[in-house]
């Protein structure tokens, strides 16, 4: 979810050094309703030390979604979040 937000919706905007988004009223974060049903399977392996499993996939989310957009419509996006307006602009640039 966190990586999805970084890639698609979350952005703090600035103008002339001033923060335009000063509260969370307009800061859109992903909703659970956006996701398909996820089944979590935990595997007990006492020989393996405990470690985090949620953080590493966050790093790849932007690239994964950018490449999916490129494969779907041929628009190469290099800035996050990847909004519909940025996709349209990339399509116009060719």
Regions found by a protein language model. Give the residues of each.
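C-terminal catalytic domains of large/alpha subunits in multi-subunit enzymes
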Residues: 1-94
